[in-house]
Curated annotation (Swiss-Prot):
HAMAP family: Ribosomal_bL33. The gene is rpmG2. Belongs to the bacterial ribosomal protein bL33 family. It comes from the Bacteria. GO terms for cellular component: cytoplasm; ribonucleoprotein complex; ribosome. This is Large ribosomal subunit protein bL33B. The lineage of its organism: Bacteria, Bacillati, Bacillota, Bacilli, Lactobacillales.
Length: 49
C-alpha cells in the first residue's frame, strides 16, 4: 500500500510546518519534536489528517 502525505502541526500554536509520508495502516498519530518557526523553538508536532 502506498504512503499518504500528512501534515505535522505544532501543538502550541497550531501552525502546520511540515509534511511527511506516513503509512495509512498505522492507527496511532505521529508525534515528533520539531522546530516551529512561529514559536521560534522546538515543540511537539502531531499528525493532522
Amino acid at each position: 500500500m502506498s504512503q499518504k502525505k500528512v501534515a505535522l502541526a505544532c501543538t502550541v500554536c497550531g501552525s502546520r510546518n511540515y509534511t511527511v509520508a506516513a503509512n495509512p495502516q498505522r492507527t496511532d498519530r505521529l508525534e515528533v519534536n520539531k522546530y516551529c518557526k512561529r514559536c521560534n523553538k522546538h515543540t511537539l508536532h502531531s499528525e493532522t489528517r
